[in-house]
Amino acid sequence: MLERPTGVTVLAILYVLAAVFFFLAAAVSGYLAQVASTTQLGEIPYAELFFAFSGIFFSITGTVWLITAYGLWKGRGWGWWLAVIFTAFGLISSLLSLPKGVVGIVVLGAILYYLTRRHVREFFGV
């Protein structure tokens, strides 16, 4: 098996860190859903429901990012595909939010460029 490229290691670690933040956001959303049900925050229409669904969304997203990190770390082809898809979606989102999306375009463009280099694709077998 090929040795994992350093950039792939960095990306996998960044995906894990992002997943941790999503899980933290899920925990905060769950807490806010609880608070909304017992305080004046609950007077805002659908506040409790909003926070509950936000928590579910963040949990699912964190799980998918953690799975992607695993795929990147282990050199699985599906991990590469997930990373490419997420990066492409982020790039499109940044393009749609110009001019404030310039930093995202540069960073995500560089990541997408890196993921499509021959030695990286060979590591993933794609």
From Swiss-Prot:
Keywords linked to the UniProt accession: Cell membrane, Membrane, Transmembrane, Transmembrane helix
Localization per record: Cell membrane
Topology versus the membrane: Multi-pass membrane protein
KW Thylakoid (keyword) present: no
Membrane-spanning residues: 13-35, 50-72, 77-96, 101-115
Residue ranges the record marks as coiled coil: none
Superkingdom to which the source organism belongs: Archaea
Gene Ontology CC entries for this record: plasma membrane
Primary site of residence: membrane
Protein name according to UniProt: Uncharacterized protein AF_0864
